[in-house]
């Protein structure tokens, strides 16, 4: 599972011209990709890590600050561009596998006290945000389990 976390001062997601999720004030926009090997354990692990990351002003986390998160599903985070010019999506989980894990991730954030705004799973979405910093981190469940690099 991959979560691209961007600190933002405001954000919104629109589907078919209607705003379906938004926040004003400091929070995180989280683009979430689910791989074919992910399980509920990865969803819980990544959500807990994201909830506690000190990415907000004053070295605070989402839970410390009571700040919101806008979570948007994004299968393209698992695009493989090693061969040719067209990305391969074979590592990205299909919707029937990915959606329950997306829901588990958001539920775990909520259990940590985070106000979660959502996109619409699988929909074509327009995401707007005002980056703060910019400050962006990528949390990858494969890297959380392995030895520290560098």
From Swiss-Prot:
Catalytic activities: glycyl-tRNA(Ala) + H2O = tRNA(Ala) + glycine + H(+); a D-aminoacyl-tRNA + H2O = a tRNA + a D-alpha-amino acid + H(+)
Localization in the cell: Cytoplasm
For this protein, the Enzyme Commission number is 3.1.1.96
- What residue ranges carry the coiled-coil annotation? none
Instruction: Extract the InterPro entries matched here.
Output: Daa-tRNA_deacyls_DTD (IPR003732), DTD-like_sf (IPR023509)
Any Pfam family from its record, for instance, is Tyr_Deacylase
Q: In which family does this protein belong, per the annotation? A: Belongs to the DTD family.
| Species assigned in the record | Micrococcus luteus (strain ATCC 4698 / DSM 20030 / JCM 1464 / CCM 169 / CCUG 5858 / IAM 1056 / NBRC 3333 / NCIMB 9278 / NCTC 2665 / VKM Ac-2230) (Micrococcus lysodeikticus)
Q: What's the stated role of this polypeptide?
A: An aminoacyl-tRNA editing enzyme that deacylates mischarged D-aminoacyl-tRNAs. Also deacylates mischarged glycyl-tRNA(Ala), protecting cells against glycine mischarging by AlaRS. Acts via tRNA-based rather than protein-based catalysis; rejects L-amino acids rather than detecting D-amino acids in the active site. By recycling D-aminoacyl-tRNA to D-amino acids and free tRNA molecules, this enzyme counteracts the toxicity associated with the formation of D-aminoacyl-tRNA entities in vivo and helps enforce protein L-homochirality.
Write down the superkingdom of origin: Bacteria
Task: Please give the name of this protein.
Answer: D-aminoacyl-tRNA deacylase
